[in-house]
Regions:
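Hydrophobic helical membrane-anchoring modules
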Residues: 90, 95-117
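Conserved core of the sugar-phosphate nucleotidyltransferase
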Residues: 3-92
């Protein structure tokens, strides 16, 4: 994984939900409060909101954060990690926003780790 940081008890709590709800897969997501848009012909086109819309009034959106995937073995043998009816397990923790792709990302993750522990 490109994010080795995990909130304490994430696996235990997520696995409990996975078993309780009887899904065949689970993946973690995090709420998104950013105002996304596209740049087309040097113009910004809002994608997830309307100009002037307050952040707190945005439609709740989520992103796959890559912290944890739980999948039944039979699905993995079919090259399926996230099934159509997978449980999106919400994790809103500082670690969910860390993605280590560069040295700067690694330095930031190390800083967070030291600060938290």
């Amino acid at each position: 994984p490109t994010n080795p940081l995990r909130p304490e008890n994430l696996l235990k709590d997520a696995f409990r939900a996975y078993e309780r709800e009887r899904y065949d897969s689970l993946f973690t997501v995090t709420g998104n409060d950013k105002k996304f848009g596209k740049i087309v012909d040097n113009k910004f086109i809002p994608f997830t909101y309307k100009i002037g819309q307050r952040s707190q009034d945005l439609e709740p959106l989520f992103f796959e954060n890559g912290l944890l995937y739980i999948t039944k073995a039979k699905l993995i043998f079919e090259d399926i990690i996230i099934s159509k009816d997978a449980l999106p397990y919400e994790v809103n923790h500082t670690f969910a926003n860390v993605d280590i792709d560069t040295q700067e990302d690694f330095d930031y993750a190390a800083f967070l780790f030291k600060k938290m522990y």
